[in-house]
Amino acid sequence: MSGWMSYFTGRKDTRESARDAIVGLRQQLLMLEKKEEFLQKKIEEEMKKAKANATGNKRLAMAALRQKKAHENELDRIAGTRLTLETQVNAIESANLNAETMVAMKKGADALKGIHSNLTAEGVDATMDKIREQMDLTNDISDAISNPVGMGIVLDEDDLKEELEALEQEQLDDRLAGADRVPSHLPASPVGQTTGRAAVEEDEDDEEAQLRKLQAELAM
């Protein structure tokens, strides 16, 4: 627990010791790798000796095999040691990563706390109310500016609509009256037809005049 707390309190010795431990373990792993390479070569050499003396010098061949077996056992031990060191390196790196992650998370939490220190739900609501109020005022001002004005005369939209409807009705009435009206003049007729009709009309006038004269005489 104290190791974890050292990260939060800002102590550098724990993080530096973790890095030093990882560096030391990796150096040891490098040495073991070189040792493994050396032993592998020795095993190959002893195997060659055993094969070369398998039929001619069995005692030497057996000695080579025993030496080969000893190198193999040593190689197995080194492999086990390497596995242990690699596991330890991974564990330290994982713990170091977790600790660094926790440090970053703590800094983030502190930053959020600092940001929210002056913020409250009530304050946010009040600010939003002010914003909405100003937006409403802006809209009212925009509407007032966009409405047409003329020498202080306030235009009633309803009155204008009624006047427009009256004009439309007047035009409609004029059209209907024009459809019912008889034309004031007739189309011109040919000269011959006009002359004949005039003669008939004159005869009718003479007859009416004679009739009126006769009625006057009878009345006397």
Swiss-Prot record:
Keywords: Coiled coil, Cytoplasm, Endosome, Membrane. Residues 175-210 are annotated as: Disordered. It is a peripheral membrane protein. Residues 15-86, 153-220 form a coiled coil. It is found in: Cytoplasm; Endosome membrane. It holds the Pfam family Snf7. InterPro entries: Snf7_fam. GO terms for biological process: ATP export; intralumenal vesicle formation; late endosome to vacuole transport via multivesicular body sorting pathway; peroxisome organization; protein transport to vacuole involved in ubiquitin-dependent protein catabolic process via the multivesicular body sorting pathway; reticulophagy; vesicle budding from membrane. One of its GO terms (molecular function) is identical protein binding. The keyword Cytoplasm applies. One of its GO terms (cellular component) is cytosol. Required for the sorting and concentration of proteins resulting in the entry of these proteins into the invaginating vesicles of the multivesicular body (MVB). Also required for the proteolytic cleavage of the transcription factor RIM101 in response to alkaline ambient pH. A component of the endosomal sorting required for transport complex III (ESCRT-III). Belongs to the SNF7 family. This is Vacuolar-sorting protein SNF7. The lineage of its organism: Eukaryota, Fungi, Dikarya, Basidiomycota, Agaricomycotina. The gene is SNF7.
